[in-house]
Design a protein with these regions (language model features):
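Acidic donor-binding helix in nucleotide-sugar-dependent glycosyltransferases
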Residues: 124
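Short amphipathic alpha-helices within nucleic acid-binding modules
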Residues: 166
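Nucleotide-sugar donor-binding catalytic core of glycosyltransferases
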Residues: 1-120, 128, 134-155, 162, ...
């Protein structure tokens, strides 16, 4: 596998995406501002530039960062091992510093399985140019059939939590820069906009649905009015 390539097959993806845009009809219904998950992703605001993020990487002082609730044995193990470490910042409870500053100040951002695998952490870390480290066995990550996850993220088995620092330090500076550059290439696919933008998170989810259009089957009475 070519770890420099962020797509499994970019040409097929681009052609299929064009066909999806041409043939797939999408109707968007507005949500209320207080709906669950309405504000789960970080606001776009002014997006950090690629050059700025690479320069910040050269000054990132923390090896790795995690902050979150201790709601699973995996997170509990992470905190037990690394809570007081000087290079891996593993934190539970309220942060004393802004969350974005921690993402900007860390080389690797830990995505640790909680009561569910899927959170906004991967999108957050990519947004700020922090290489995601996924610590969760038997997981299904977003867009895995489109994106080459190994080109911009690291997978660590939960049993290897005590070896986390050793694993991360195996990556040379050049290898880390390759991972980070690839992370910046794919971050557009994980970003959410109030009005969808081509290839953003909304369109990528629609593309995933479009790919599975022939495998989704609904009962014949699904659209029959009860009256």
């Amino acid at each position: 596998m070519n770890y420099n390539e962020v797509y499994h097959d970019r040409d097929i993806f681009v052609e299929d995406y064009k066909e999806m845009n041409r043939s797939f009809k999408i109707y968007v219904y507005p949500h209320r501002r207080n709906d669950p998950f309405a504000n789960v992703l970080l606001p776009m605001g002014s997006e950090p530039g690629v050059i700025m993020l690479v320069k910040v990487t050269l000054r990132r002082k923390k090896l790795a960062f995690f902050a979150g609730k201790i709601n699973s044995p995996v997170r509990e193990k992470l905190l037990q091992v690394w809570r007081n470490d000087t290079e891996i910042f593993a934190h539970s409870g309220r942060l004393k510093t802004p969350y974005a500053d921690e993402l900007l100040g860390s080389k690797f951002c830990l995505h640790v399985k909680g009561y569910e695998v899927n959170t906004a952490r991967i999108a957050d870390s990519l947004y700020y140019g922090c290489v995601p480290v996924i610590i969760a066995d038997y997981h299904d990550l977003p867009f895995a059939d489109i994106l080459n996850l190994k080109s911009f993220s690291i997978d660590v088995a939960t049993l290897d939590i005590p070896l986390l620092k050793k694993i991360l330090k195996r990556f040379s500076f050049e290898e880390y820069l390759m991972l980070q550059r690839n992370a910046l290439k794919v971050r557009k696919h994980f970003q959410w906009h109030l009005s969808p933008v081509d290839y953003d998170a909304f369109y990528m989810v629609m593309y995933e649905l479009w790919l599975r259009r022939s495998s989704v089957r609904l009962p014949s009475n699904a659209f029959v009015h009860p009256n």
